[in-house]
Design a protein with these regions (language model features):
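Membrane-interface micro-motifs in multi-pass membrane enzymes
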Residues: 33-41, 92-95, 148-162, 200, ...
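Alpha-helical transmembrane segments of multi-pass inner-membrane proteins
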Residues: 45, 74-79, 101-105, 114-142, ...
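Membrane helix-loop boundary segments at the extracytoplasmic
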Residues: 27-37, 308-311, 344-384
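A membrane-periplasm/extracellular boundary helix in multi-pass inner-membrane enzymes
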Residues: 136, 191, 195, 213-254, ...
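Juxtamembrane membrane-water interface segments that cap and precede transmembrane helices
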Residues: 23-25, 139-148, 294-305
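Transmembrane signal-anchor hairpin modules in multi-pass inner-membrane enzymes, especially those
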Residues: 1-92, 101-102, 108-121, 169-179, ...
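Long extracytoplasmic/lumenal interhelical loops at the membrane interface
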Residues: 247-262, 270, 274-311
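Hydrophobic alpha-helical transmembrane segments
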Residues: 43, 312-323
Length: 404
């Protein structure tokens, strides 16, 4: 290859790499404000990344321990599509599979600890601004729960995970100024989360913080229930009522969920292997709803119940396997991380995933595009941390082998 051609190729590759990184910053900055901007920026990042592969004529893809799980899950989606009761609708919902690319575009293009930290800072700044807006909207109109675009569940899921991320940074960060800023972000997002009045997200945060405390310092575990008790004593009566009925099966929203899950079980029994397809379940729900029900639901407010109904036993097995593989990856990454930057990212990823799983027992948060995008972004950040850990270990081995 001629020298001029090499220079041109190198310049193009650097430009595409810069576009990829810039698009990733836009992705996280837009995450709490606009799913359209978020996914457009993500698409730009993916296209620029693929273009780099074409220019370099090699695969710029970081392998993970998740490939088999992803393949099985995608296969379950496609099998369910073939046997769906509403194939056109199932085709539309295949778009959720595209979000998985987030794991690889982030994991393969974040090439330094500084970039990891800057992406985390960008995310927390955006989420803190969003949370301050949410608190302000509540002050103006306290009769309305804080909402994100159209529902409080999305706001709850986003602020729940942002609070976890901020708390992780505060726990692992060595610089006092940054630690205080992270703590402020955790408080802002935590207050906004509380004002969404979404109990499933509250519980997800509480469990995640207990896990985080146990990983950082077991003595901190007692802090979480103490904070919860103090918060309970300080809140107005209507919030106390919702907390006190957390596990009351007769409480209105709890009773609704139990009814929805029972109806989901009836649908599953008639479609046990491949489910009804990844669709809006409103139409088929009407055929199975009991005489006491007045409204059909388009999803089942539980990730595993919804997957069982829509993808059947095959899909439920594949989805559960994927969740387990992700958890194992996050645990291994946390154990391997050495530097403060890598430890805060892996702690945020692991505890954020725990919060997502717990919240997903009460909401279809995997089907929420905003929350799912955030989930895959966090997993991608941990993949990048794993890559950086391997590189640092390799460099360390070289230093040991080469005499000084």
């Amino acid at each position: 290859m001629r020298e001029g051609s090499i220079d041109t190729t190198g310049s193009l590759d650097r430009t595409l790499a810069a576009i990829t990184r810039g698009a990733l910053y836009v992705t996280v900055a837009a995450m709490p404000f606009s799913i359209a901007v978020t996914q457009t920026a993500l698409a730009v990042a993916v296209l620029a990344w693929l273009s780099r592969m074409a220019v370099q004529r090699r695969l710029l893809l970081q392998r993970t321990s998740l490939e088999l799980a992803f393949v099985l899950y995608v296969a379950a989606e496609l099998v369910a599509l073939v046997f769906s009761v509403n194939v056109p609708n199932a085709v539309v919902y295949l778009k959720r599979l595209l979000l998985i690319a987030t794991v690889y575009v982030v994991g393969s293009n974040v090439e330094s600890e500084r970039t990891l930290q800057r992406l985390m800072a960008t995310f927390l700044l955006a989420m803190s601004l969003y949370s301050l807006w949410g608190v302000g909207s509540f002050v103006v109109n306290p009769s309305v729960r804080v909402r994100h675009i159209q529902n409080s569940m999305t706001a709850g899921g986003l602020t729940m995970m942002a609070t976890v991320v901020a708390a992780a940074v505060a726990c692992e960060q060595k610089e006092t100024r940054v630690r205080l800023l992270a703590l402020a972000a955790a408080i802002a997002n935590g207050v906004c989360l509380f004002l969404t009045n979404t109990r499933g997200s509250w519980l997800g945060l509480a469990v995640a913080l207990v896990v985080m405390a146990s990983l950082v310092d077991w003595r901190l575990v007692v802090v979480v229930p103490v904070l919860a008790i103090l918060a309970y004593l300080a809140v107005p009566g209507e919030y106390k009522a919702r907390v006190s009925h957390f596990f009351d099966p007769h409480y209105r929203t709890n009773a609704y969920r139990i009814t929805w899950w029972k109806t989901g079980w009836r649908i599953f029994k008639d479609h046990p292997v491949t489910g009804v397809g990844d669709i809006d379940t409103g139409a088929i729900y009407r055929k199975y709803m009991g005489p006491e029900e007045t409204q059909a639901v388009g999803h089942f407010h539980n990730n595993f119940v919804h997957i069982a109904v829509t993808l059947g036993a095959l899909g439920l097995a594949a989805f559960t396997f994927l969740m387990v593989r992700i958890l194992l990856l996050l645990v291994a990454a946390r154990r391997a991380a050495r530097s403060p930057a890598l430890r805060e990212v892996t702690l945020a990823g692991l505890c954020g995933f725990v919060a997502f799983l717990v919240n997903g027992l009460f909401e279809w948060n995997y089907g929420d595009a905003e929350v799912a995008t955030l989930l895959w972004w966090l997993v991608g950040m941990v993949v990048a941390a794993v890559v950086l850990t391997r590189r640092s270990l390799a460099v360390g081995a070289m230093v040991v082998e080469v005499p000084g």
